[in-house]
């Protein structure tokens, strides 16, 4: 028996609408995207606009991949983050599917400031976000 090849997920119009809602209207703090049974990228969860950073980590499944678009707000403004969540305990097939979806989304969604790939919560701690947006001094 052969393992089916991962397919490139189609991005649902809902994903693009929610992305615009984050980017231009600050309607959400973030969205978690998943690939459904029909290989469509769909919105799994939304994070409220004025939510706490801890809500992001609490929303992540421990054994499933997700793509997250997250607006991180700081004293210097806000930045959009594209996060690939592939925990070590997720099935390898899912990691391949989401890896392909990550490429498709990165091309489609314009205006992302930073990208993060994470397999554990330490890799998406608030300090990681702060380090990404803080200008480096020489």
Swiss-Prot record:
Keywords, sorted A to Z: Actin-binding, Cytoplasm, Cytoskeleton
GO cellular component, one term: actin cytoskeleton
GO terms of molecular function: actin filament binding
Residue ranges constituting the ADF-H domain according to the UniProt record: 7-134
Biological process per Gene Ontology, one example term: actin filament severing
Cross-referenced SUPFAM superfamilies: Actin depolymerizing proteins
Main location: cytoplasm
Record Gene3D superfamilies: Severin
Purpose: Controls actin polymerization and depolymerization.
Name listed for the protein in its UniProt record: Cofilin-3
């Amino acid at each position: 028996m052969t393992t089916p090849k991962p397919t490139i997920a189609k991005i649902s119009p809902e994903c693009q609408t929610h992305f615009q809602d984050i980017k231009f209207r600050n309607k959400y703090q973030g969205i978690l995207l998943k690939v459904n049974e029909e290989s469509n990228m769909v919105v799994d969860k939304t994070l409220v606009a004025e939510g706490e950073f801890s809500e992001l980590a609490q929303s992540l499944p421990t054994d499933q991949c997700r793509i997250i678009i997250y607006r991180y707000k700081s004293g210097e403004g806000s930045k959009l983050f594209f996060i690939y969540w592939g925990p070590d305990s997720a099935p390898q097939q899912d990691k391949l599917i989401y890896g392909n979806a990550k490429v498709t989304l990165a091309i489609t969604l314009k205006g992302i400031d930073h990208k993060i790939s994470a397999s554990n919560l330490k890799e998406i701690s608030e300090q990681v976000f702060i380090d990404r947006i803080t200008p480096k001094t020489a």
